[in-house]
Amino acid sequence: MNIQQATRQYETWLAGHVRVVKSDLGTKHELMAQDAFLFLRATFYRWMQLFPALCPKAASAPTVLAIGDLHVENYGTWRDAEGRLVWGINDFDEAFPLPYTIDLVRLAASAWLAVELGHLSLVPANACAAILEGYTKGLEDGGEPFVLAEKRPLLREIVTSRLRDPTLFWEQFAALPTIRPVPAKVMLMLKQEIGRAHV
């Protein structure tokens, strides 16, 4: 089965479980074609088809509740029940009992691709070593939350914008096509509310 067949099969399956917007799939296909990293992000179904044959030893590792579609952009921050800023994995839509190696190999592959495409300034082998070291240390330490206010001042600075420039994000956001214009009544209400906030 080639990638086109695998994608059609996956999207047919998906349409049987959720409402699929055809134009969104077209956009997804365009993004997938832009580079290898975006392709990896969008094709977990294909990864699962090929991984057992390409990495048979890793595929026979013990099973855990894995993230599945793990890659370097599936990390972020949120507030926990106590209001603390926590950093970690933030995408669980494809979590499933799988060999634990799936997450490690996929995360390492994504880091390697991100480096190759200039998205990360690391030596690929160092990125892979850091992933393995972090995973091992996390197991040894009991998997405590990564609370930024406690032991991670540099990461906290990055995610609280002191070292991060949001300009690129907003430029990309503004470049997205308008799917449906905001109704005039809603726009008027927003402008009135914004005006009140500045008084």
Model-derived regions, located:
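Catalytic or ion-translocation cores adjacent to nucleophile or general acid/base/metal-coordination motifs
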Residues: T101-S110
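Acidic active-site catalytic centers that drive phospho-/nucleotidyl reactions
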Residues: D69, D91-D93, D103
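Hydrophobic residue at the +6 position relative to the catalytic HRD Asp in the kinase catalytic loop
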Residues: L70-T77
